[in-house]
Structures are given as structure tokens and as C-alpha cells.
Amino acid sequence: MNWEVVIGLEIHTQLSTKSKLFSGAAVGFGAEPNTQTTLVDLGMPGALPVFNKEALRMAVMFGHAINAEIGMTSVFARKNYFYPDLPKGYQTSQMDHPIVGKGYLDVMLDDGTTSRVGITRAHLEEDAGKSLHEDFQGMTGIDLNRSSTPLLEIVSEPDIRSAKEAVAYVKMIHSIVTYLGICDGNMAEGSMRCDINLSLRPKGQKEYGTRTEIKNVNSFRFIEKAIYTEIERQADILEDGGRIIQETRLYDPEKNETRSMRSKEDANDYRYFPCPDLLPVVLTQEYVDNIKATLPELPSQKAARFQSEHALSEYDANVLSSSRAMADFFEKANNVVKDPKLTANWVMGELSKLLNQEQLDIENSPVNAQAFGELLVRIKDNTINGKTAKDVFQAMWDGEGSADAIIEAKGLKQVTDTGAIEAMIQTILDANAAQVEQYRAADEDKQKKMIGFFVGQVMKASQGKANPGLVNPILAKMLKG
């Protein structure tokens, strides 16, 4: 059977506010359990919530960034369910009247095509606490530090048709929220988590199949692997004549499998109703317009500028603008060397290679943008060639000093004196007279192949320091005799 995968994603982004959504408690990762709570977070009777206006501003910013309708009147609702880390017995969320309505994103895929993913809504809600199962014998600890932390839940339409497309969409959301400064995007710390709703249907069928939901996947790689794993599981069941059970599942990265957690609830099971402790949030057009006017440059806008200002390819511009930190690094380095293509090649090449090897973010690069740009200047002005520059960059990475200091200490400057290069070439031609005669007797096509031997001899004699841009034309001229 030829199956079509149907995917919708719910992305939970933790907003970078200083305090919680409905209390004055601080928001922070890694504090001692239950040290960042108030009576509101603990669900104590009579403790009333106070809405965080900064979270509202951030939600409206995001709405503008995804071309969405802004809910001029939004309502908080109680989502009722029981769980040990939810002391109130309900989660304050939004249902019928979210702060952000329908929007969309045009997602660039690896093959250069664009896919439009509709966004159903983005609503504000409070996070729950956290159950701690380690270090407790036969018991579960409850940490309510996370309780009432502001979340913006971004719900897509079921428009996604592959794991690659899903990851590209999540990366784009990640890029937008970090550019806006409304979320730090740290998936390892839970600042951004993804729920995957997935079903299969025969190719050409309009009706959706029965979906499962994979909860709280917290890395791009795991999102892709979880989708592939669940597609395979569902396809095996359907092809054996079985049926898919609507349920919530968990992805286990160590075993690379999804496993059942509980039956999947519908909205009716949560008995949503308007929260009596919070008034409807009513916005003015002036408020909405003022926020739109203060939006920073977004990833798609930055990519377009990189193409127009720096004549970069669409691919290079999209890669460099995919993260705000990488875009900033590129621009700072390019301000030093003033050669966008050279800077782009080195940021996406050597810098990215070492960052990946060391599993570092670009913000934690041992070589900052200024120093990186200074290295590129030495390539541009022919002080060193590209091959030597890689060795210098590695030395800079290892903390041996600046580019200039390393070049000087190791005697790596290129030979750019044409007289010295001519003398070096003459010595090599004298020592290889037979090869010179063969070269001069050969036709043009064969000469192009043979000249590499002489270039290699020059580079060997100069210990790689001869400037190739000077060697090649001088050598060609002297070989003619």
C-alpha cells in the first residue's frame, strides 16, 4: 500500500518573561525545587491570578511574524484534568478565543522548494509543574517551579507531509521566536517542546486516518526519528489488517521506538469553560499596530537582504539567516573583511565544521567574529593562502593567539615577491629539463594536465608559502621559454 503521511504539530514555546504568566514568581531553569513559587502557583484557595502583560506583547509579536489574525478579544479558559503536578486541578489556557488566530509560514525545504504550512492558532497558557521520579524510593517528587511559566502553544494545520518538512517547519518557528527574543529556544532545557500528531491514509484518499500524538519531543533530530518510527509502526499495523488506536505516545530515543502512554483525549474531555478569575483581554488597534512597528528584522527578511546587499545565493542567505546568532556572527565578521562570499564560505565551512565537532553553539565559539574576520583579511590580502588559513584557524581555536600572531610566530606568510618566485621556478625548471621539453612539445590540452606537476614542485619548494595566484601565470610564461 502506498501511504500518505499527515502531520500536524503543536509547539510549546516558553516565553522569556522575567516572571510567570499569572504570578510574580521568577522564571528560571535549574533552581532548587519549589523555590520559585507563590500561593497562586501552589493552587492555594483564594489566591487570584494576575495576568502578565509582557507575555501578551510577545504573543502579539509572534502573531505578526506568522501573518496571523490577532484576536482583539481573547479569553482564558480552564482546561480540567488531574495530574499530581497540577495542584489546581486545571490548567489556565485558551480555547475558543485565542490571542493569535489563523496564520501561515512558507517553509524552505532542502531541495529548494517552498511549502506553505497553515497555523491554526497560537494561544497563551500556563505550564504545569514537574514530576521527579529519580532519587525517590517508591515515591514521586513534585517540583512546582515550572508551574504557571508562560507558554505560547503554536498549533499547525495538518499540512505537513514528511519528517523533513516537519523539521524544517520547527526550525523556522525556532528561528522566528529567537529572532523576536520571545524564547531562548533551548530545547534541551524544555524551552521549546513539540507534540507530533500523525496519521496515515492511502494516497489519494481525502479522509484522515486515526491519529496518534507523540508528546514532548525536544530536539530536531528526535522529531525526525520519532516521525519515521511512528510511520513505520502505523504502516505495519495497517498492512497487517489492524487498526490504529487514537492515543498519546512517548518517543524513546535510546530504543528508537514510540510507546503508549494513555488514550488520546478530545477537547470535550477537558471540560473547557471561561476562567472566572480572569477578565477577557481586549486589545486596541493602536496597541497592535505599535507592536508591529517595533518588530525586528525576521529571518526571511534578513535572508532577502543578504541576497540583495551581499549578492549571496538564496541557499547561502537562508543558511546564514537560519539563526540570529549565526547571522550576527556573519555580519560582524564581514564588517571586518568586507568580502561577503569569502565570509559566508568560511562561516558555513570551517567554522561550522569545528562547531559541529565540538558540539558547540556559535555563541560559544572560541574564536569571536572580530578575530574570525581578521583571519579572513589575511586570506584576502594574500598574506596566507586558504590551506594555510585552515591551520591558522585551528591554532586560533586552540587558543594560541590571534591570526597575525600565529602567522608571525610560525613564519606562514606567503611568498609574494615575484622575483623570488621567478628564481624558485627557474631552479625547478633547470632540475626537470626533460619534463620541460615534454611540456613544450605537447599540445595545449596535455599541457594543462602537465602543468600541475610543476605547480606541485613550486609549492613543495616553498613549503606551501608561494602565492598560487602569482605562481600559475609566472610558471606558464616561463614554461613557454
Curated annotation (Swiss-Prot):
The protein's enzyme class: ligase
Superkingdom assignment: Bacteria
GO molecular function list: asparaginyl-tRNA synthase (glutamine-hydrolyzing) activity; ATP binding; glutaminyl-tRNA synthase (glutamine-hydrolyzing) activity
SMART domains in UniProt: GatB_Yqey
Enzyme Commission designation: 6.3.5.-
Chemical reaction(s) catalysed: L-glutamyl-tRNA(Gln) + L-glutamine + ATP + H2O = L-glutaminyl-tRNA(Gln) + L-glutamate + ADP + phosphate + H(+); L-aspartyl-tRNA(Asn) + L-glutamine + ATP + H2O = L-asparaginyl-tRNA(Asn) + L-glutamate + ADP + phosphate + 2 H(+)
Keywords on record: ATP-binding, Ligase, Nucleotide-binding, Protein biosynthesis
One Pfam family, short name: GatB_Yqey
Keyword ATP-binding on entry: yes
GO biological process: glutaminyl-tRNAGln biosynthesis via transamidation; translation
HAMAP family according to UniProt: GatB
Similarity-based family: Belongs to the GatB/GatE family. GatB subfamily.
The protein's role, per its UniProt record: Allows the formation of correctly charged Asn-tRNA(Asn) or Gln-tRNA(Gln) through the transamidation of misacylated Asp-tRNA(Asn) or Glu-tRNA(Gln) in organisms which lack either or both of asparaginyl-tRNA or glutaminyl-tRNA synthetases. The reaction takes place in the presence of glutamine and ATP through an activated phospho-Asp-tRNA(Asn) or phospho-Glu-tRNA(Gln).
Subunit structure: Heterotrimer of A, B and C subunits.
Protein's name in the database: Aspartyl/glutamyl-tRNA(Asn/Gln) amidotransferase subunit B
Gene behind the chain: gatB
